[in-house]
């Protein structure tokens, strides 16, 4: 399954990348100011969205906390 991370290169984003690597998940990282702007990020995910935002498969899962819960619920660990 392909995953996507919208990242600002913060420590939280690096944790999300390590998580996906550890569960052998293929992913693509989109980086703030290289692949998208902050305005585009908030237009897509909302004004209160924080980095990282993660999609697994074709579905947006949310931030790191929501992604961890999804992975736990789906026995991905």
Predicted regions and their residues:
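Short phosphate-engaging motifs
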Residues: 12, 37, 63
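Structural micro-motif
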Residues: 45-55, 64-65
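Local sequence-structure signature of Cys/Sec-based thiol-disulfide redox active-site neighborhoods
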Residues: 1-28
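Thioredoxin-like thiol-disulfide oxidoreductase module
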Residues: 31-48
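Non-catalytic, surface beta->alpha helical segment in thiol-disulfide oxidoreductase systems
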Residues: 56-77
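Conserved residues at beta->alpha junctions
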Residues: 7-8, 32, 58
């Amino acid at each position: 399954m392909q995953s996507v991370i919208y990242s600002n290169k913060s420590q939280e984003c690096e944790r999300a990348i390590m998580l996906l690597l550890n569960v052998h998940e293929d992913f693509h990282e989109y980086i703030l100011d290289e692949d998208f702007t902050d305005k585009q990020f908030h237009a897509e995910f909302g004004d209160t969205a924080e980095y990282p935002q993660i999609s697994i498969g074709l579905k947006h899962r949310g931030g790191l906390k929501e992604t961890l819960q999804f992975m736990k619920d789906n026995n991905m660990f």
